[in-house]
């Protein structure tokens, strides 16, 4: 069962154009108003992106609070994970100047605020994984990951994701 269309990846095609074809407009990036932390840190050719949670999303159609498996359906949590991934791309673009510099999505981590009996954390995080694969294709978008159920998140968010992106030099 394929839930999304994978665009043909070619070297000349720009990621921003692909997003536009998908009807996706990047939201404002996550910029933390703090001296002791940042929403992304570059070390060598890796960009470490801080957690992006549902409470930070601009989309009013996304579920921003609640526990998956009780107040939030698996389908809504999947859509929320996808929206968090879109917000992450906005942050990546803000920090490195352009998404075409992403050469690999190395890893994503998902924290799912879920009922203790909920067992499909991996399906929720597929919202982000499917999105990255759809946008970047197999070579760049296929990544390692983990999905973990937790007893709670800040502001009762249903999900928070962070990631590691490999980037090219300017």
Set out the residue ranges of the language-model regions.
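N-terminal presequence-like segments and the immediate start of the first folded domain
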Residues: 2-86, 90-109, 114-170
